[in-house]
Amino acid sequence: MLIPREFFLQLGGFDERLETGEDYEFCQRACAAGADIVNNPQLRVVHHDFPRTLRQFIRREAWHGRGDLRSLRTFLQSKVALGASAFLVAHALILTGLFLPGMLSLLPLGLLLLILLLAASTWKKYRYAPWHSRFVNGGLFYAYYLGRSASLLYLLQRRSGRTPRLA
């Protein structure tokens, strides 16, 4: 992120109270103050501690997802948090359809919701990519939403008084 120091200080810098998403929140304030956010693909970004395994990726997304759960407002404004909620609902429908007698009709509904969520996410992000790449990224979106929905479960556990643990 490149920004004049004076403007950064005028906006109050990053909100240090935020566990995650402080850069996104800062950009929202900058836009509200009249800044234009421009993505320059020629600039290279290095992320330290980039996940090297699927488990690390899911854990990182679970941590990132906690930023969307600061308040009901941030939750409702986050397409990702809403997508993670749909992910959980789809799995609840699938499991209910599989394991509760007389509820088999919920199985196709849950599968449809899950497929639509993954397809819409993949289409939005990779609509210009080759078809085989879209299928692979659909699988990665499954892991992405698995991590993001884990942060929702983390919040529910914390609110219920249980000690949450992200594996």
Q: Model-derived features: where do they sit?
A:
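Short, flexible helix/strand-to-coil boundary loops that buttress conserved ligand/catalytic motifs
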Residues: G12, D49, Q157
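Catalytic donor/gating beta->alpha subdomain of glycosyltransferases that bind UDP-sugars
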Residues: D15-L76
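Membrane-embedded multi-pass helical conduit in multi-pass membrane proteins
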Residues: A86-R159
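Basic/Trp-rich segment in TM-proximal cytosolic loops or flexible interdomain/linker regions
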Residues: D49, L54-L104, Y128-R134, P164-A167
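Conserved nucleotide-sugar donor-binding
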Residues: M1-G12
